[in-house]
Amino acid sequence: MTSSSSPGISLKMEGISYAAGAELPVVIINVMRGGPGLGNIEPAQGDYFQATKGGGHGDYRLIVLAPWGPQEFADMTGEAFELADFYRIPVMVLADGLVGQMMEPVVFRDPPRRELPPKDWALTGAEGRAARRVVSFYIGAGVLAEHCRKLRAKYDRIESCETRSVETDVTGADLALV
């Protein structure tokens, strides 16, 4: 897990891209602030595209959860660990700076549990088994393209299974923009 606000997240983008390429479960908290550049510490939503379109180099995506208040922030942070572990993907909890500055009591609930796949990728020592490597550098004809196809299939599955939204005041609307 790591956390920061806007410019700090930008500095972490190479590592986040590496984690996505290596399929490492990581939770990232980004409490957005004003920008561009160093900006200010006022609430802002300027990191939306960076988070949702893959802010570092390469063909990758993150799962992005965006809480609207402190309780949902607490709930989504717990859920982020489950999602990261289940899909082997970085998950970003992306909060407006205003949410990051709010104070109210929260209840730390257990997130919905999933049956997790075996961690046969984890580096736990090689005693009694073949060595494992965590990489995001793929060399050789077609190796990277095949890896990107595998990741794309995962992203499509996540989009199909995990996309969610809250509808407010849309009854009777012909069109709703998200």
Where are these regions (language model features)?
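Conserved thiamine diphosphate
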Residues: P43-G97
